[in-house]
């Protein structure tokens, strides 16, 4: 989908309605943007039901996803929720942290937005903002990426890196 601030929920809906098992939301920098990302992946539910927040805003229309998943629509509605918020959920909401504001707010995001399945480090844009474009081995960039990893470990959230090589796999 588009960047986090653009709130183009329809792009997440389209991907999920085609049968994708998750969506990566780039440039998430605030609690509000992260909440919108998770909400875009969830169907609405009654307020008195468990796991209400974040309130789902995904529109209906999963016929192709049901065919792709090989299940009925009713089964799809049961399983098409975000993991780990819904233990039975099979949709993964991944947010990409790509700037210093995202790093600054990451702890609050993970504390206040249930349903984020993983964090993906956006090293290219992060290195650009830090003044070292595509210098992903620069100490300043490495320090920023290490901070993301440390926060994710502290908050017990999976963190990923898009360009894993033998030389950086342990990071």
Q: What do these predicted ranges mean?
A:
Residues 1-171:
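Expand to "…catalyze enediolate/carbanion chemistry for C-C bond making/breaking, isomerization
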């Amino acid at each position: 989908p588009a960047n986090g601030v653009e709130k183009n929920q329809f792009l997440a809906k389209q991907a999920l309605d085609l049968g994708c098992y998750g969506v990566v939301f780039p440039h998430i920098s605030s609690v509000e943007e992260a909440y919108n990302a998770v909400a875009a992946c969830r169907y609405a539910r009654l307020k008195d039901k468990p796991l209400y927040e974040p309130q789902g805003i995904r529109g209906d229309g999963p016929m192709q996803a049901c065919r792709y998943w090989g299940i009925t629509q009713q089964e799809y509605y049961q399983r098409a929720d975000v993991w780990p918020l819904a233990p039975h959920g099979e949709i993964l909401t991944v947010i990409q942290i790509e700037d210093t504001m995202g790093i600054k707010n990451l702890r609050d995001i993970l504390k206040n937005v249930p349903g984020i399945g993983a964090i993906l480090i956006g090293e290219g844009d992060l290195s650009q903002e830090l003044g070292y474009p595509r210098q992903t081995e620069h100490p300043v960039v490495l320090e920023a990426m290490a901070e993301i990893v440390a926060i994710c470990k502290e908050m017990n959230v999976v963190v990923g890196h898009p360009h894993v090589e033998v030389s950086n796999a342990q990071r």
